[in-house]
Amino acid sequence: VCDGQLMTEIPGIFSCGNALHVNDLVDYVSASGELAGKSAAHFAAHTRDEVAVTISNDFGYLVPQRLDRTQDNSAVTLYFRSAEVLGPCRVVLTVDGNEVWSRRYPFLRPPEMQQLTLDFDKLGIADASDVHFEIEVAKA
């Protein structure tokens, strides 16, 4: 489990690259290494205010699983895989039960990692906010 700055549940310990999750491209490995390094430097000088990011069972995983509200969350890169092969579907983000973002996919497959970047700073996330991703499968 890590947050949007790649810090694990152990304060001051950061994870990146394939130690965090299996990446499809080496470019993603390098980008996560840079983010982890910058985040470690920020951690040394600041306190944290975290909120959990939860997912539905249709996800195999989603990274990050937490957001630190004291950080710049205007361009958080998320990576996820579906738990199973899915036909036409929609990934939906809700904050406190209100839909705030969605994206349609013609299909999702577990071997294919998906990447998206979201501006969480504009979503009004508070201390006790429920930040949740789910996959809605289109009905035939």
Residue map of PLM features:
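FAD-site-proximal beta/loop scaffold in flavoenzymes
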Residues: V1-N23
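C-terminal catalytic lobe of FAD-dependent flavoproteins
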Residues: D72-A140
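A conserved FAD-binding loop/helix module that cradles the flavin
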Residues: C16-P64
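Surface-exposed loop/turn and secondary-structure junction residues enriched for glycine/proline
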Residues: D3-Q5, P11, Q65, T70, ...
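Residues in flexible loops and secondary-structure boundaries
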Residues: T8-I10, C16, D27, P88, ...
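Surface beta-strand/loop "capping" patches
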Residues: T47-G87
